[in-house]
């Protein structure tokens, strides 16, 4: 009986140690929301530094000490699906955020340009930020930076700490300037994700084609034109983007592949089918469930103490 008792105690103590180790390994601690984050934009193309490139930074969401986000007032009116968003999801959503910025002429929180080494350094407070770069001409090349979203401070998963010095490297596309007046085309395609509930969709939606941040043309997409449109005879020496007027009951996501923009509207109507989607939201990783582990460890410890006291009482 004594051996069984000793094994039980050892097993419980082992559970406590494993649980405590798990807590230590997965909790990066609280974010110091008053501390500045040093952000460096490092802009290169094929290992060549791009100087004189202008970047604008927009704060999309504030963050608290527990890495919980709250969308800022500037972006609160837009249908932003902030729940269950991983870092890759946010980057896929960056073009949509850029379309909001262009359509409504939102002012950036920070602006600057890269130096001779292709770097721009600034300091910001913790939060979720959209970074938008402008087209940049250097010698006979034109460079375009893909917009991206960054959560600050950064997360060091190996050391389980928050990093308050972060370097971000935007994806750059480069092409030689055309020697003649080259004309291009742009296409927009609408996709509905609503369980094929066509009766719930609006009869048409409004799409704006924007040129360097200004509205160039406006069209209506509907079933008659198969929810698509093509613009021809556009000047290649400008940056083109589409935006969509908000559709009630739907979120929107704009992506670009080559010369085609895809505008996807996803229904926000809740269904009764249980969702099995895993929460991969970057700011929540390893931060919200550690209190439950601590309670588990405390509970196991209480059980061990209780059994020890009971055995002591029985032995008296």
Question: For each of these PLM feature ranges, what is it?
Answer:
Residues 2-316:
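Solvent-exposed loop/turn and edge beta-strand elements of beta-rich ligand-binding domains
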């Amino acid at each position: 009986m004594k051996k069984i008792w000793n094994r039980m105690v050892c097993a419980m103590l082992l559970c406590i140690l494993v649980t405590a180790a798990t807590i230590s390994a997965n909790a990066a601690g609280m974010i110091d929301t008053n501390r500045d984050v040093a952000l460096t934009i490092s802009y290169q193309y094929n290992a060549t530094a791009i100087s004189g490139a202008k970047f604008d930074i927009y704060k999309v969401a504030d963050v608290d000490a527990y890495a919980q986000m709250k969308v800022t007032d500037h972006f609160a009116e837009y249908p932003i699906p902030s729940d269950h968003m991983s870092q890759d999801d946010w980057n896929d959503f960056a073009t949509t955020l850029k379309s909001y910025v262009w359509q409504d002429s939102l002012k950036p929180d920070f602006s600057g340009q890269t130096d001779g080494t292709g770097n721009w350094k600034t300091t910001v407070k913790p939060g979720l930020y959209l970074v938008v770069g402008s087209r940049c001409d250097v010698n006979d090349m034109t460079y375009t930076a893909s917009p991206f979203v960054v959560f600050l401070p950064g997360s060091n998963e190996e050391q389980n700490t928050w990093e308050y010095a972060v370097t971000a490297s935007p994806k750059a596309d480069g092409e030689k300037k055309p020697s003649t007046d080259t004309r291009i085309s742009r296409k927009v395609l609408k996709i509905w994700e609503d369980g094929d509930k066509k009766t719930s969709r609006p009869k048409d939606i409004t799409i704006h084609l924007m040129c360097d941040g200004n509205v160039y043309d406006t069209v209506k997409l509907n079933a008659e034109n198969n929810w698509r449109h093509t613009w021809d005879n556009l000047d290649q020496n400008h940056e083109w983007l589409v935006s969509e007027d908000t559709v009630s009951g739907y979120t929107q996501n704009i992506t670009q592949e080559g010369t085609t923009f895809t505008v996807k509207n996803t229904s926000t109507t809740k269904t009764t089918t249980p969702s099995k989607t895993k929460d991969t939201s970057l700011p929540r990783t390893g931060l919200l469930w550690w209190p439950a582990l601590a309670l588990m460890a405390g509970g196991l410890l209480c059980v061990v103490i209780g059994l020890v006291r009971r055995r002591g009482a029985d032995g008296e």
